[in-house]
Regions:
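Outer-envelope beta-barrel architecture signal
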Residues: 38-44, 74, 83-87, 118-122, ...
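Membrane-embedded beta-strand positions in outer-membrane beta-barrel channels/transporters
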Residues: 43, 75-77, 110, 161-163, ...
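Membrane-embedded beta-strand positions of outer-membrane beta-barrel proteins
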Residues: 44-46, 78, 89, 113, ...
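Transmembrane beta-strands of outer-membrane beta-barrel pores
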Residues: 48-54, 82-86, 91-97, 117-119, ...
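Extracellular/periplasm-exposed beta-strand and loop segments of Gram-negative cell-envelope proteins
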Residues: 67, 135-139, 146-161, 203-214, ...
């Protein structure tokens, strides 16, 4: 499966690299009544954001669920965009970091990038994390209080994925206007979106992921699982819409639903009763809000993506989610003569 995954990613990246030389293929002819292009302008911005991964454990026999999160923090950075070039540099802000006493320490490495061309969106994910805590531990474990959560420094995750989607109404609808600020949506418009993705989530721990203190009536058939993995190939379809208000304001909402086949693995050995290859679903959503004041702009963007898996026993449901939030303040400089 690793070979298939590697070949699949290679084909996607190879296709993307060759497509860059085909300017007409990537660049859409814009309806100037709907979209204003800032291609020749220099855009400088200050931004703060957070990227994280969530691990949701759901008992499929009832409403009970657990959520693990890494200890999060906000980045503070600066960015610049000019024509096809964009660069962003950010650093961790200690004052906005959650308490290590309460949530524990998380070690992390990865790149989470969202690329918007005129016709396509490309989401890239590489995330390696170690160290999680159980959200609202005191409601699940009687020995914990609100002052300190149940911490799992042994839980680690490796998440890799790429998603490519085509924007059908690319002449009138602009993702760039909502999330990269290199264009302006002048009139409200929407678009059908379709494409595909390949995603790999791997989670492991030194002992069972479900805490031993949890009431034994929950997760009765899957309390000993310490490893899980998902390799998914999905076809995606969805819709995005941008509502323009007060001439310079924009509110964008999109939802993409994916379905396909995925390989599920649990533990070092696969139980014969577990159906590894099966059809499952994922979904992703985007929300953007922005407003322009002449050459200045303020933007808030939120992106959420989740891939689901479960045991054949119908006992444990696992949702792997990636989250991205960013607040930007920027200014546009005209370099045209």
């Amino acid at each position: 499966m690793k070979i298939i995954f590697t070949v699949f990613c290679f084909l996607i990246f190879n296709f993307s690299a060759e497509a860059k030389s085909l300017n007409g293929y990537l660049t859409a002819k814009k309806d100037t009544n709907y979209i204003e292009n800032y291609y020749n302008d220099l855009i400088i911005r200050l931004y703060s954001g957070e990227k994280t991964h969530s691990l949701d454990l759901n008992d499929l026999n009832g409403p009970y669920h657990l959520k693990y999160l890494p200890n999060g923090y906000f980045n503070l950075g600066t960015g610049v965009n000019f024509r096809s070039f964009g660069l962003s540099l950010a650093t961790k802000v200690p004052v906005f970091q959650n308490s290590e006493f309460k949530h524990g320490e998380t070690k992390r490495f990865g790149i989470q990038s969202y690329i918007y061309s005129s016709k396509f969106t490309v989401d890239l994910l590489t995330s390696f994390l170690k160290g999680y805590y159980l959200v609202n531990s005191s409601t699940h474990l009687s020995s914990y209080t609100k002052d300190k959560d149940y911490q799992r420094p042994d839980i680690s995750s490796a998440n890799i994925g790429v998603s490519v989607n085509y924007i059908f109404n690319n002449s009138r609808f602009s993702y760039r206007a909502a999330f990269s600020d290199t264009e302006r949506q002048k009139k409200s418009a929407g678009s059908l979106i379709a494409g595909g993705s390949v995603i790999s989530y791997r989670t492991k721990a030194d002992s069972a992921i479900v805490p031993r203190e949890i009431d034994p009536e929950y997760f009765m058939k899957s309390r000993d699982i310490s490893k899980s993995g998902v390799l998914a190939f999905n076809a995606n379809i969805g819709y995005a819409y941008s509502f323009v208000f007060l001439k310079n304001g924009i509110f964008t909402l999109s939802y993409v639903l994916g379905t396909g086949i995925q390989d599920n693995t649990f533990g070092s050995e696969v139980d014969s009763e577990i159906n590894r290859w099966r059809f499952r679903m994922n979904h992703s959503g985007r929300l953007g809000f922005g407003y322009r004041f002449n050459r200045y702009y303020l933007r808030i963007g939120v992106i959420r993506s989740t891939q689901y898996t479960n045991l054949k026993y119908n006992d444990l449901g696992i949702g792997n989610g990636t989250n991205f939030m960013q607040v930007s303040l920027g200014k546009r400089f005209s370099l045209r003569k």
